[in-house]
């Protein structure tokens, strides 16, 4: 596992912490008849190794290889799709109820981490499932971390349980004493082993004599050493014997067995290629859109006490570690709780603060109702720093940032920026904070700065580059504007005259841009977003409303995008420079009628 992740990148620390647990699960349960649902999928690598994918494990996260998350189309042993957090209990409960309807006595097993318990969805599932009388077993893998250190009262609550001695050790000690007691000892042990009210019921109790899980209707077992196979198998067999919803609480060490990962589990949660001997990544993450965003936000906040930073358990991923280090009182990590993060930000805004919520595009999808109801209708000014906007690469379908634009443009009065380079990112962040009202969004990609186009005329609106004698206009925004600009240069060098338009503020579109575009006979729009509901459709619609008489073409992303490198994906979907040149030439030569 370590060798493969060092070459391919991936989620290492969480998987190393779940090796023994996964082995025990597969020894006690009968997959795929018993359905094992992995929350997020960050812990599923050993599961893949044990379920027929050892010979393909070197392809994990590679193009045409196995996924870094569970994926039912990949294996019958992957009972449910994973990628986003806190979904396992609801999914496993649904599976358990379906089994019950069918008279199927197999088990539904949800494997979740304590980090997922910072997300609200999992409590909806726990609340609904606890008293259901189904064969549902929830395994809580408690390593005191999600991606970074867990936050909130529930993390402290679980830690208080974690610090108690496990019930199995106590149970065995009692059994040993009783077994050595003449005459009556062994019969008592037999009774204890067959009773559903075993020694575990006296090991851990809070003042009200129950755990939160028992209050919700579950039988609670644990905590158990998650690196002791004997203990794990015993507690899982015990859980099976109840035939009722059970929570098994397991303590593990994130990064177990690999010193660099144990020392820095947050850094080894999701890591790029690295040197096994030192643990050092091949490429530094100090220079990327996320860190540029984080440093610029800190710079602004040092001058303005109203600015606050909010993250949903992604402090390092979104570059907010700089803000956190220097302005702790205005930094808020709310856990894996995007809905709460948005409404919490709206609350800050209602009191005159300027909250900036940095969030991955794919995770923002979970909070659309709050953006509409609590931010926009409520007329609260918040700024979204939408990280990983566009293609993200090896994490595949569940993580591509392709749907924020269709979702956000449906919200009245939202303003959206999509800078094409670091300097524009800084400019857009400043404008979103100080010149916008209501919902202001700045979206930026995974990766590094673009270098091809002329940066002497950067702004937060748009840039036209004209030949003054062209009938063809090329349009784009964000990262792939750099690819389009390279195509533009190549075409003009081949005497294919064309003009180019770079949008920086992509929504709402300025009327002047549409008016200026009406003169062209052909307009071709490229975007790194879902073409359905994308800016290219909005742009085309505005042209039609103004009686555009030319031909309009759009090239964006259709369907779900599978894992590969960003470069390979852009080539595959036709959004790299060479593919753009071919597409444009085909339109000019063959008059392809594609919209």
Segments from the language model and where they lie:
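Extended, hydrophobic alpha-helical segments in both membrane/secreted and soluble proteins
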Residues: 108, 112-125, 319, 331, ...
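Cofactor-binding active-site loop characterized by glycine-rich and histidine/acidic residues
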Residues: 3, 11-132, 306-307, 311-312, ...
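Short beta->alpha connector loops at strand-helix junctions that form conserved
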Residues: 334-335, 359-360, 418-421, 527-528
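Cofactor-/ligand-binding subdomain signature composed of acidic, glycine-rich
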Residues: 1-4, 260-276
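Short, well-ordered alpha-helical packing segments
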Residues: 22, 26, 96, 109-113, ...
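Short amphipathic alpha-helical interaction patches enriched in hydrophobic/aromatic residues
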Residues: 5-9, 217-220, 412-415
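Helix-enriched interaction subdomains in cytosolic or periplasmic regions
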Residues: 273-275, 409-453
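Thiamine diphosphate
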Residues: 59-91, 101-105, 131-267, 279-326, ...
